[in-house]
């Protein structure tokens, strides 16, 4: 029962946090000092030529997770569809390369539903895939350039026989990754 109550509390609080507008504006560096979004502050630290960078997930409950983050950002909440197609493709490519480097072919990457974002900067969760997960409908694609836009819903991706299975419509997509 306690677990159920904690889960409900987390979902409600994440939803409320996500509905608060992000004050970060890269054109006004003073707004980044508020540190409302740690990922925006990290993006500002990266060199101008960086397209995608990685940070280890800071949650102690997710010690083996990484976040793939595009350096590019804009004022307010950032969504995947706001990234230019070339940056989005590089984000997917880089996340997949990092996942393969860490976990071989037993990896997964996830983009949670927009209403559940607790950080305003776009990011992809990179982790080891939980054994045996494969449910719901999915689209089979050949590579990162074919990954569809998630829209407001989340998605998660994993490899199967040299292709990518893209599961669309998952709200909390990162639950398929080991903590």
Question: What are these model-predicted stretches?
Answer:
Residues 7:
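Generic anion/oxyanion-binding catalytic loop in active/binding sites
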Residues 1-4:
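Positively charged n-region of N-terminal signal peptides that target proteins for export
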């Amino acid at each position: 029962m306690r677990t159920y109550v904690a889960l409900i509390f987390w979902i409600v609080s994440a939803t409320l946090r996500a509905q608060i507008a992000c004050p970060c504006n890269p054109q006004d560096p003073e707004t980044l000092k508020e540190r409302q979004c740690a990922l925006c502050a990290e993006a500002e630290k990266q060199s101008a030529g960086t397209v995608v960078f990685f940070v280890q997930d800071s949650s102690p409950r997710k010690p083996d997770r990484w976040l793939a983050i595009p350096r590019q950002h804009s004022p307010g909440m950032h969504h995947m569809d706001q990234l230019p197609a070339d940056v989005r493709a590089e984000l997917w490519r880089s996340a997949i390369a990092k996942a393969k480097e860490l976990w071989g072919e037993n990896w997964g990457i996830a983009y949670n539903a927009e209403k559940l974002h607790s950080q305003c900067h776009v990011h992809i969760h990179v982790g080891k895939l939980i054994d045996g997960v494969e449910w719901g409908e999915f689209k089979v694609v050949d590579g990162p350039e074919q990954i569809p836009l998630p829209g407001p819903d989340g998605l998660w991706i994993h490899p199967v026989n040299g292709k990518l299975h893209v599961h669309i419509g998952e709200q909390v997509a990162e639950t398929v990754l080991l903590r």
